[in-house]
Amino acid sequence: MSLFRSTMLRRQLLTSRSVCLRYSSTSTPENVVLPRLQADLKNAMRSKNKPALNTIRAIQAEIINASKTAKPITTDSALYSLIQKQIKSSSASIEEFRNAKREDLVEKEQAQLDVLQGYSGEIPTVGESEIDELVKSALEGLEEGKRSAGHVMGRVMSSIKGRAVDSEYVSKKIQEVVGAK
């Protein structure tokens, strides 16, 4: 091996070690579902559970696609928003299949929806009562001129940052409170 190559290898090993070390960390919520997806995929393969297998593969494909963008899915809160998006898409598909009288596809999509809802229920989210309190405190902290839905939403979402939350409920609650005042 040449001197240049051995020096480059040593340099790469030293730099990669320093990047991987973490001396302190912020308190982020523990991932529950994300690390378990691979094991669930293997279990679905062993038990020949087609709906779970297809759903987990679709989730993993979305995670891989997102890893190639600026916002990779590395936490359960990001996974929660992905799953909610897929639940919404699946629900719309079920309605379309019902309108087309395709009960076979409705059953297939419903089985996938059940798997998605199972994963969605396992991820800890911000409760509705906490969201209500955050909306009220954000509204009280703003001046009269800046009490628009956008300003309140910005404050609420910045205080929830890093945690899984039902964005539709937050938006609905902000519209109620801002519209009432």
From Swiss-Prot:
It comes from Pyrenophora tritici-repentis (strain Pt-1C-BFP) (Wheat tan spot fungus). Gene3D superfamilies: 1.10.10.410, Uncharacterised protein YqeY/AIM41 PF09424, N-terminal domain (1.10.1510.10). It is found in: Mitochondrion. This is Altered inheritance of mitochondria protein 41, mitochondrial. One of its GO terms (cellular component) is mitochondrion. One of its GO terms (molecular function) is carbon-nitrogen ligase activity, with glutamine as amido-N-donor. The keyword Isomerase does not apply. InterPro entries: Asn/Gln_tRNA_amidoTrase-B-like, GatB_Yqey_C_2, YqeY/Aim41, YqeY/Aim41_N. It holds the Pfam family YqeY. Belongs to the AIM41 family. Residues 1-23 form a transit peptide. Keywords: Mitochondrion, Transit peptide.
